[in-house]
Amino acid sequence: PICANPHADSLALSAMRLIGPNLRAAYREPRNAAAREAMMLGATQAGLAFSNSSVALVHGMSRPIGAHFHVAHGLSNAMLLPAVMRFSVGAAPSRYADCARAYGLSGDSDEALAQALVGAIEQLCADLAVPTPRAYGIDKARWDELAPLMAEQALASGSPGNNPRVPDAAEIVEGVLGRAGSIDQALHQALDAGWSL
């Protein structure tokens, strides 16, 4: 990634070590003070990390989704994160593997760890009831209609240029927003299991 640096990386990995084992508990047990404390520290570290490195594709895509469909920024990030990770993972397997280790996963190779992390984040989104765009109430026809514009708006933000795999507008529409049949079915399911493509 263009803006990655050792300072931001250390903060991001520390945040993952805190958030990974505590997010579900903080979500399910709002009075769990230890989990909430870990989440506050992890969230602060994550914020410091991206403040010192910038953001990438998922944030760039979340802005137009929020503008067009009135989805809160954090929620739209969560909705898209598995799809963005699947799109990006092949361009930075060692970095994803570092994140997987920080998250508490183990594996035989960087590639296996990177894929395990994508699966773990998909499961996390399911466990936390992160809705698909359709479950949130977004009309598929309107989503498809606005996908090219949202892709252009994301690119104009500059954020996708920081992604490990830098997309063009067509790749955002096809590879992240899931419009075309050229991407694998797992990505479609990760983006929105309720939509038939």
Where are these regions (language model features)?
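Alpha-helix C-capping/helix-to-loop hinge sites
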Residues: 1-2, 26, 46, 68, ...
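Intrinsically disordered or highly flexible coil/loop and linker segments, enriched in small
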Residues: 4, 28, 32, 49-55, ...
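Alpha-helix N-cap/helix-start motif at coil-to-helix transitions, marked by capping-box chemistry
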Residues: 6-17, 55, 75, 90-93, ...
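Carboxylate- and glycine-rich phosphate/diphosphate-binding segment that chelates Mg2+/Mn2+
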Residues: 1-53
